[in-house]
From Swiss-Prot:
This is Autophagy-related protein 2. The C-terminus (1237-1862) is required for the location to the perivacuolar compartment. The absence of either ATG1, ATG18, ATG9 or VPS15 also prevents the correct location. Lipid transfer protein required for autophagosome completion and peroxisome degradation. Tethers the edge of the isolation membrane (IM) to the endoplasmic reticulum (ER) and mediates direct lipid transfer from ER to IM for IM expansion. ATG2 binds to the ER exit site (ERES), which is the membrane source for autophagosome formation, using basic residues in its N-terminal region (NR) and to the expanding edge of the IM through its C-terminal region. The latter binding is assisted by an ATG18-PtdIns3P interaction. Transmembrane segments: none annotated. Residues 632-659 bind DNA.
Length: 1862
């Protein structure tokens, strides 16, 4: 046939055949080479595909070029097509992407094959004709097209001839099948380029073939490769020396040259302008950038033969070496089988490439959605099949195509998949690095078991770094590693996917592996963000085209996952491994629950085995079990073995879980515990039991707390819950684990890959992603998840029910630390911060079968707030701690000390090794702490007492920096409380509704109800802490403590308890005596070896005995003997005695001795000091030079403490706080009273016997005899020892024999209440006969004791601006040094620490009721005005170690005090003495230091004192016993001047062991020599005489001084006269005031004795009324101090059952001190309430019987302490005029008193006219009537004189205001 066909006819025929394939555009005849025959061959060049005739789903064909194409037509083999250089350019199609029809893919293939069959087989319906000419063929072709068009336009023709197309369809199907069976296609060098706005991908296939055998289509390909051209991404790790960018072109080389294989005139073809799809793709003007970019991609310069990938480097993503695709059928695919040999994937560039692609698709979807919304109704283009496309009308075949859209999948097999996490992928699929981290998958098979049922297996899944280094692998076995199946649900067309991992897996992780994994994971969030945005835009577009699609989208495929156990082994160091074992995991997407039965963390530390620790039994391991179910995969019953011996371990119950989704897998999950590696060297440290994670389809509400701790609900897309977490390990292992983790994470750094040069890119890929906020756009997760990102939404929620931990051997000998945390809620907010809430936290110490609480929660009624609230942000952590009780025990101090010593050794070793460079974070991490209702309990070592610090509110900040750690805190109020014995506590620290207080300070009131005593208050406390390093315990530390107000309210017993408790808060460190003092020298020492005994002897001819005596004189004799002084003769010469130079040398040696570098200053001894001269203010008073300033400067200060208190108030109360103290005093009084009563009975018995014996005697004789006996008894009572007993070394109970026993209780009360008048009687000797018979009956009123704390304080100490500075200058401890030779300068001294105390103002206030003076100690104003910034008290204390080898230390003290003014009342002095001497052996620690602090030197700088002393009683018994100090009570001192000599220094010991006599001997010479004159001048009897005589002296001395100086006699006389007048006038006026005041006092006392008011007449009216009301017997008066009793009494309806007192409730003022009413003993109330209430209130009493309770309850009511004794010198008038006015008022007031007395007596006389009554009333009124006018006169004269005195000397009034109570 080919012989007679012309060449042009052959070409036209072949062109027609090719055009009928619907694949190619117009074919140019010059590029067509035809050779026809039996083996016809057609060769085509640069053949272009027609984009309009190629329809690929979701893509547009932009360009298609085939470089060379050969078609071979044979009669036997059919058609063979061979093509080389197939280049296709695609772009995503948004319109087809909306409504994707799977049938279009099949139809396009059918259309091409049908056209081929039409071209090959010329079917004629009428007859067979020969082929027509070229022109005829063309005309027929055109006519056939028209007919086809007409048929398309006439639908009636289809209906009229329904059967004819069926016949033609069957014939056409056979023709297509025949054509395909003889068609063979082979393609080489296939390049498929997919271009988008911001990314370009390329698929290269080396070779692909298509053939059909027995109806089975087979497609084979080799060398398929996927690469990315744009953007520039990191390809992965490459061998060193190779550049990541192989392009060497400059910026002038445009990237358009990479596609130069395309024709130059391609843009002018009909491809651009004729296609409607191109216009649809360019919906908005924003896409013009894309067209300008792609236009260059599609152009090609002429004569270019380079491959598209040769000019621009591409990054390979994946490579497939070979694969085969087989299927059957044409319009519907059946038995599709895919077999792939090997796939290599490089993961490193995938995230960035995929992110760029998803960003582009999301942007284009958004544009399409906007365009579709504007052009409603939708104009989405659909494919229309017509005859012009070359398809004949075949209705039956068309229906078959449209309905057959499903494909028949058979199997998928992949032999191997290798995914590299870090290596780049080179050519031919080879990885650039051989030992890269790769994930390998072998033998992946997926098969269709039945219709809608897919089953797959994965034989091997592992991850390795090399052939020998496995990172992850499953346990070897015959089973597959992974099995899965997919079951189609016909009802909703969804799949039930089941995934099963039946074999245990093991992960081996190290630093390098984690670096690669973290590097890859760091890129995932941005890709997920882009994917979420794409899904959101796609869902929005779908909902726009089909609004009902949202309801269908709610249904998703169900996924069921079940795994065996997994082990994660983390290699921290070469010797430290941590293994995490996750027991079976299950997941059900239907319920959204991920459940892990248990997670166990174990550790393997080689050093543990070296130390000999036996491997511990793992109490977290699970027991193996055998499976019994063979058809269904279920979770078996598993039981957790718990060690019941552990205090915190919970008994875990059995749990059974069933998964309903695993129904078609034939094999069971084996026992996970039996499959795990059984390495006994691992030790279990952590258990996580019952982990569940809930993934909600829609956000749900979870109950949690807000930032204030109030319960609320949040929306969360997921929630997790952990039932139990247990931690158990030793503290050493814990610290070593922390160190290993710290070192590991310091070395663990995410690899920062080098950024590619994207300057050449014209479109830069931009993406913003915040790892802490993965979704910035709330709508990025779809319409359903967008609602959760509101102000009350969470990203995730976690709840932990219980956490238990046990840290063994926390410190050396400390024991174990156990704790439990309950109800932990974790809120992970959308904004990136996290909130943590802890319901309760309990921590305890376990040591030797005993436990000690460390931290616990205090429950309050109705308080459901969590104990701890924490909020974690990027660089800050905020913690709120409330209702917490912390415990401290004194024995812990030794453990902390040992820990500090170990830290020092470690630091020393590190210093020897050298500094270790570690990368430090330059950013600071801040922890903010807020405290509310915090109780700190202080437990001493040996004492039974306990202290509590109650912190109401506080806040603090901790800042961790790279080189420093700083802590600052502020506490609003701290209340210290104290209890003497813990057994006296009434109940536990637990609040409930029964004993809760309605007041705000419920915790504080609760503590006081339990038995604690409030000791004061600290307000506005600020603490700051700074150190140079946060990683070391011995780094230099600087602590600053500031407090606004410190108030301390104490009694004598509570003060001693407090001081000893503070001392007992640390366990004393006992150092052996030999080690402390080193009494035995290492080498023999001859102290007198080099001593020249004759060096200082002036005459060697002296008597040898004197020389010997001088040599043997001891140091103490020389230093303390004041007789060694040179004798001064009258002519001024000195007698040189033998011991003079010896004495001087000794003193010089003492004063100038040095301790190494420590220099002691030299004394300036000046014997005499003039006290008459005024005080000369020196500017350098406080800037003296002392041994403190001459010490060497220490560059390194390990610790520095600065304490600053603005105001300090120490108030001393009388009475006793502790009940045991009061009971002891009561019992002692009873014992003395019993002895006195027995002696009194014996005396009465003797007296009665004598009376009966002498009954015959006369009355006078009897009286004389009785008087004699009484005298003898009296004399005997004086000579005999009195009945006495001493308590607490300060309370002396004594009663002379024969005295009334009841007087002892009265005296005790008077001593406490300062009633001197009635107590003086005990000082006198009385005989038993003087006691009347009525007095022998002890009334309850006289026997009651009042021993509780007084209502008002008696003495107050006030300090202003107290500053204490403590510097630790040396942290050297010689007890820890074993090698003495390593000590530097062992014989030199060093200063261990230094304390500096400064006080701006110092004041002691006298509040004793019987004292008329206001202050006790204050500043001496006569000394002049104080200098600016001068300190009233300055004290320097230095602790010195004499030599560095000694463990003992000594102290040196320097003190400076400004001039002081003292007003000493004997009552106040006795109170302070009794207060200070109190000592209770209960509060003495059992273990104390061997020696007290040794004060080697005390230096007191000159102090000027002015003293007023007012004695009241004289202890004659003390005088008789040799107490000579009682003689001072005979004299009153007024302005006595005392001055300590300059530079008073004590050298020697001042500890308790030093004899007090020695101390007095040292100071007595100075007092007798220098101070006696000032003391005698201050005697009140001669003070005025001395001052008047000094005025006469000035009258003579001043003129003489003036005349001697300048010769002016008259001026001197005038000055002398003025001084004389002023001095004499003042003293005369003062003397007159004293005489008048003395007279008034005598008269008032006389009146009071005779029944008048006395000095009460001068008291305010309110005080008198209060006293009269309390003394009246009209009704009972009660003061209730117990709130419970008060609340019970309020419920009583009858006032007769309980009479509430006339005062307000004491609880409301329990912190106030100024009460208007008495502090009645609460035990006095006990007798007035019901017995059962009394037993309830006194359940903690120490008495043994009820009688003793009642005896103490009959305590006498205190006198009115608010009644002050007002002096006649108080309230002085300012001027003479005011004095006269006050004189007139006082005289009138006294006259009125006399009138009232007369009128009162007259009215009573008129009522009763009896003579006796008249006489009684007259006698009662006479003293008042007679004495009151005289008292008024004296008072008036006194006021007038005081007015004149103050006007003449205004300073006198200011002195009186400071001295007297007003």
């Amino acid at each position: 046939m080919a012989a007679w066909m012309p060449q042009n006819i052959q070409k036209r025929l072949l062109r027609y055949v090719l055009q009928q394939l619907s694949l190619f555009a117009e074919i140019d005849l010059p590029n067509l080479d035809v050779s026809l025959g039996t083996n016809s061959k057609v060769h085509l060049k640069e053949l272009q595909l027609d984009p309009d005739k190629v329809d690929i789903p979701n893509f547009y064909l932009r360009n298609g070029v085939v470089d060379d194409m050969d078609l071979t037509l044979t009669l036997s083999n059919g058609v063979n097509i061979e093509a080389t250089g197939v280049n296709l350019t695609l772009a995503p199609s948004m319109t087809n992407g909306v409504d994707f029809d799977p049938g279009k893919l099949s139809f396009s293939l059918y259309q091409s094959t049908a056209d081929l069959a039409t071209s090959v087989f010329f079917v004629d319906q009428d007859n067979n004709e020969l082929p027509k000419t070229d022109k005829e063929l063309d005309d027929e072709h055109d006519s056939s097209k028209n007919v086809a068009n007409d048929d398309d336009s006439s639908p009636l023709a289809d209906k009229e001839n329904p059967k004819q197309p069926s016949k033609m369809g069957n014939m056409m199907a056979k023709a297509v099948e025949m054509a395909l069976s003889r068609l063979q296609v082979q393609l080489k060098d296939i390049n498929l380029t997919i271009i988008t706005d911001e990314s370009t991908f390329q698929i290269c296939i080396e070779e692909a073939s298509f053939d059909t055998t027995d109806g089975v289509r087979k497609i084979e390909f080799k060398g398929a490769e996927l690469s990315v051209l744009k953007p520039s991404v990191y390809p992965g790790d490459q061998p060193q020396g190779e550049s990541q960018d192989d392009s060497e072109d400059d910026d002038s080389v445009d990237e358009s040259s990479s596609f130069d294989s395309h024709p130059t005139d391609f843009m002018s073809s009909s491809f651009i302008g004729s296609r409607e799809e191109l216009e649809n793709s360019m919906l908005n003007s924003q896409s013009s950038v894309y067209m300008s970019a792609t236009s260059k991609l599609l152009t090609k310069p002429k004569h270019s033969t380079r491959h598209p990938s040769e000019t621009k480097p591409s990054v390979t993503l994946g490579h497939v070496n070979e694969g085969t695709l087989t299927f059957e059928g044409l319009q519907s695919f059946e038995n599709v089988s895919i077999i792939i040999d090997q796939i290599h994937v490089a993961v490193s560039p995938i995230p960035e490439s995929l992110t760029a692609l998803l960003e582009t698709l999301s942007k284009r979807l958004k544009i399409l959605r906007v365009h579709s919304a504007k052009s409603k109704p939708s104009t989405t283009t659909t494919y229309t099949f017509s005859s012009k496309d070359g398809l004949q009308e075949e209705p039956e075949f068309s229906d078959q195509i449209s309905t057959s859209s499903s494909t028949g999948f058979k199997e998928l097999k992949i032999n191997e998949i290798v995914i590299s996490l870090n290596s780049a992928l080179g050519k031919n699929g080879a990885f650039a690095i051989d030992n890269s981290l790769c994930l390998s998958i072998e033998s992946l098979e997926l098969a269709m078991v039945s219709e809608g049922n897919l089953s797959g297996t994965l034989k091997t899944l592992k991850m390795n770094k090399s052939e020998t280094s496995e990172v992850f692998s499953f346990q070897p076995g015959s089973n597959y590693d992974v099995r899965f199946e997919m079951i189609l649900d016909d009802d909703n067309d969804l799949y039930n996917i089941t995934i099963l991992c039946p074999k245990p897996g093991v992960f081996n992780l190290n630093e390098e592996v984690l670096n690669h994994l973290l590097s890859f994971c760091s890129k995932i969030p941005s890709t997920l963000h882009s994917l979420q945005s794409y899904q959101y835009q796609k869902a929005k577009l779908a909902s726009l085209s089909n609004p009902q699609s949202n309801s269908n989208n709610d249904q998703e495929n169900e996924i069921y996952l079940q795994t065996a156990s997994f082990e994660f082994i983390l290699q921290l160091t070469s010797s430290d491994k941590v293994k995490l074992t996750s027991f079976p995991l299950s997941f059900n997407s239907n319920t959204g629950v991920i459940e892990v039965e248990r997670i166990v963390v174990e550790r393997k530390f080689k050093e543990n085995q070296v130390q000999g620790d036996p491997p511990s039994q793992d109490r977290f391991k699970m027991q193996p079990h055998k499976s019994t179910n063979s058809g269904c995969l279920t979770c078996r019953k598993r039981q957790v073995k718990c060690d019941e011996r552990k205090p915190f371990c919970l008994n875990c119950e059995k749990s059974e879980q069933k998964c309903t989704g695993f129904t078609h897998l034939s094999k069971d999950l084996p026992s996970s515990s039996s499959s795990l590696s059984s390495d006994d060297s691992y030790k279990s440290i952590l258990l996580i039991n019952g982990l569940k994670t809930y993934l909600f389809k829609k956000p749900k509400k979870v109950k949690t707390f807000d930032k204030s701790g109030i319960q609320c609900s949040y929306l969360s897309p997921n929630a997790s819950e952990i039932e139990l977490i247990e931690l158990e390990m030793t503290m050493s292992d814990f610290t070593s684990l922390i160190d290993s983790l710290e070192l590991f994470f310091e070395q663990l750094k995410v690899v920062n890959h080098p950024k590619m040069d994207i300057a050449k890119e014209k479109t830069v890929f931009r993406t913003s992603f915040n790892s802490r906020n993965p979704v910035r756009n709330p709508r990025a997760l779809g319409s359903q998840t967008g609602a959760m990102f509101s102000h009350s939404s969470l990203v995730s929620f976690l709840r932990i029910n219980s956490v238990s931990f046990l840290l063994k051997e926390a410190l050396n000998g400390f024991g174990d630390v156990s704790g439990r945390i309950k109800s932990i809620n974790c809120n992970f907010h959308v904004k990136g911060f996290q909130d943590f809430f802890v319901g309760s936290l309990d921590v305890a110490r376990i040591h030797k079968l005993s436990s000690q609480l460390i931290l616990e929660k205090v429950d309050a009624p109705g308080n459901k707030k969590p104990m701890l609230i924490a909020r974690l942000k990027s660089s800050s952590l905020t913690i709120q701690l409330a209702d917490c009780l912390a415990h401290y025990y004194g024995e812990w101090f030794s453990f902390l000390h040992q820990c500090n010593m170990k830290e020092r050794e470690i630091v020393k070793r590190q210093e020897d090794i050298g500094p270790k460079d570690r990368a430090r974070d330059s950013n600071n991490f801040v922890i903010s702490l807020h405290l509310n209702n915090i109780i700190i309990e202080l437990n001493p070592v040996s004492l039974k007492s306990k202290a509590v610090l109650f912190i109401k509110k506080g806040c603090g900040t901790v800042t961790f920096g790279s080189q420093r750690l700083s802590i600052s805190s502020s506490l609003t109020e701290i209340t210290p409380l104290l209890i003497d014995d813990t057994k006296n506590l009434k109940n536990e620290i637990k609040l409930d509704s029964k004993n809760s207080h309605p007041l705000g300070n419920s915790f504080l009131l609760l503590l006081m109800d339990m038995g604690y005593i409030s000791m004061g208050m600290l307000s506005s406390v600020s603490v700051s802490f700074e150190t140079e390093s946060s990683a070391s315990l011995i780094a230099p530390v600087n602590v600053n403590v500031m407090c606004d107000t410190l108030r301390l309210d104490i009694c004598a017993d509570s003060l001693q308890c407090l001081l000893n408790l503070i001392k007992d808060l640390r366990q004393p460190i006992i150092v052996p005596f030999e080690q402390k003092y080193r009494t035995q020298p290492e080498t023999p020492l001859d102290a007198l070896k080099d001593v020249d005994f004759d060096a200082f002897l002036p005459q060697k001819t002296k008597d040898s005995n004197n020389v010997a005596a001088t040599k043997t004189r001891t140091f103490s004799e020389t230093a303390l003997n004041g007789a060694f002084r040179p004798k001064v003769y009258s002519d001024g010469s000195l007698e040189i005695i033998d011991n003079y130079y010896e004495h001087e040398s000794v003193n010089q040696g003492l004063d100038n001795r040095t301790y190494g570098d420590l220099e002691v200053f030299e004394e300036n001894s000046e014997d005499d000091i003039s006290l008459e001269n005024s005080l000369n203010m020196k500017h350098d008073h406080f800037y003296h030079t002392s041994f403190m300033d001459n010490t060497r400067n220490t560059e390194h200060v390990p610790f520095k403490l600065n304490l600053s208190v603005e105001a300090v108030y120490i108030r001393l109360f009388d009475g006793y706080d502790w009940k045991e103290t009061r009971v002891s005093i009561l019992n002692a009084v009873r014992r003395v009273e019993a002895k006195a009563a027995a002696e009194l009975s014996r005396i009465e018995k003797i007296r009665n016997t004598k009376l009966r014996r002498d009954s015959s005697a006369s009355n006078s004789g009897n009286e004389g005899s009785l008087q004699t006996d009484d005298d003898s008894a009296t004399s005997g009572s004086v000579s005999e020892p009195v009945i006495e007993e001493t308590l607490y070394q300060s309370i002396h109970l004594s009663l002379p024999v024969g005295m009334e026993p009841t007087l002892l209780a009265e005296r005790v009360n008077n001593d406490v209440n300062f009633k001197r008048a009635s107590s003086d009687s005990l000082d006198k000797t009385q005989s038993p006969s003087s006691v009347s018979s009525k007095s022998q009956v002890s009334s309850p009123q006289t026997r009651r004791l009042k021993l509780k704390r007084s209502t008002f304080h008696k003495v107050a100490l006030e300090l202003r601006n107290l500053s204490i500075t403590f510097k630790l200058l040396s942290s050297f401890d010689p007890t820890t040094i074993k090698n003495k030779s390593s000590i530097r300068n062992p014989n030199s001294a060093e200063i261990v620490n230094r304390i500096s105390v400064e006080v701006d103002d110092f004041l002691i206030t006298d509040n004793i009721p019987t004292s008329i003076w206001k202050t006790f100690v204050t500043y001496l104003k006569e000394a002049g005005s104080r200098e600016l910034n001068s300190k009233m008290v300055h004290l320097d204390i230095a602790t010195i170690r004499p030599t560095r080898l000694l463990a003992t230390t000594e102290m040196r003290i320097e003190t400076n005090v400004l001039p002081l003014r003292l007003y000493v009342d004997q009552d106040t002095l006795d109170f302070l003495t009794r207060f200070g001497e109190f000592k209770d052996l209960r509060f003495v620690p059992q273990v104390v230091d061997d020696d007290d602090l040794f004060v080697s030197k005390l230096h007191v700088f000159p102090v000027r004192l002015k003293l007023d002393y007012k004695p009241k009683t004289v202890d004659y018994a003390g005088i008789r016993s040799g107490k000579t100090s009682e003689f001072m009570n005979f004299f009153i001192l007024d302005e006595a001047s005392i001055g300590l000599r300059k530079g008073w220094t004590w050298i020697g010991g001042l500890n308790n062991q030093v004899n007090s006599h020695t101390k007095r001997e040292y100071g007595t010479p100075d007092i007798t020599r220098n101070q006696l004159k000032g003391v005698l001048s201050g005697l009140a009897s001669i003070n005025s005489v001395v001052k008047i005589s000094s005025g006469f002296k000035d009258l003579i001395a001043i003129p003489m001084e003036e005349y001697r100086r300048d010769g002016r006699l008259i001026t001197g006389v005038r000055k002398g006269a003025f001084s004389f007048a002023k001095t004499t006038g003042n003293e005369l006026l003062k003397l007159g005031v004293k005489l008048v005041a003395g007279t008034q006092t005598i008269l008032e006392n006389t009146e009071q004795v005779l029944g008048g008011e006395g000095n009460l007449a001068r008291m305010p009216v309110q005080v008198k009324e209060r006293k009269q009301r309390r003394d009246s017997d009209e009704g009972n008066f009660y003061v209730i101090t117990d709130r419970q009793t008060y609340e019970r009494n309020l419920k009583k309806t009858s006032m007769n059952e309980s009479i509430i007192g006339k005062t307000s409730l004491r609880e409301a003022n329990r912190f106030d001190e100024e009460y208007d009413d008495d502090d009645d003993d609460e035990d006095d109330l006990v007798n007035k309430i019901k017995p059962h209430l009394r037993n309830t209130m006194l359940d903690s009493q120490l008495f043994l019987d009820d009688n003793e309770i009642e005896d103490e309850x009959r305590g006498a009511r205190r006198p009115d302490e608010s009644q002050k004794t007002i002096s006649l010198y108080a309230n002085q008038p300012t001027t003479m005029k005011e004095g006269l006015q006050l004189a007139y008022q006082s005289f009138g007031r006294n006259i009125d008193s006399a009138k009232r007395a007369i009128s009162k007596a007259s009215s009573k006389v008129s009522e009763d006219n009896r003579t006796s009554n008249i006489a009684y009333e007259v006698m009662k009124a006479t003293p008042v009537v007679v004495l009151r006018p005289i008292i008024g006169t004296t008072e008036a004269v006194s006021k007038a004189l005081l007015g004149g005195l103050n006007q003449f000397d205004p300073d006198n009034r200011s002195k009186s205001e400071d001295k007297y109570k007003q």
